[in-house]
């Protein structure tokens, strides 16, 4: 009995002293969202053939304006998303989550909150908004990144990580957590009310939806896209 008690105490101590991690610590299996060879698992916003998006060296590339936003075929609730992005000089794009479809919505950002992808140095949107909340890694028009130097310049690859779990979100950029944010509740409602999205019916109200990649008219690359549900 004494030995069992000692063993139990040791196990409790080991658990208590496990290192702290992101709240995405307990995870499911990683699933590749883009195989680098085809657009399997993706579709065009409002339907139709995927054009003006190409695949080059294992990356999906918006080659010219008019390709339209791309959505995952599947929908996700709580998840961890990882990808790499590279923006052209003066370019703009973004990644949205919990996107809803429907004729009443003009575009994915009508419903899906956006993590900004931008040439912070040269795109004018970088200098708009408030306190940097239009810069790369920001929760667009709501919360700025806490480190404006985390982003790499246009033409270089950046690594994004987005975690959504239990009403909370994290935006990571190149290994640094740059934004913590609620995804629901009074604090979220206040953030929306103080943003351009005030009064947008359906914006940020869903607990599940598509992942979307934005065509903002500028050349942009995405690769190594994977997700796991939490």
List where the protein language model places each region.
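Bacterial Sec-dependent N-terminal signal peptides
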Residues: 1-25
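Carbohydrate-interacting regions of secretory-pathway proteins
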Residues: 22-230
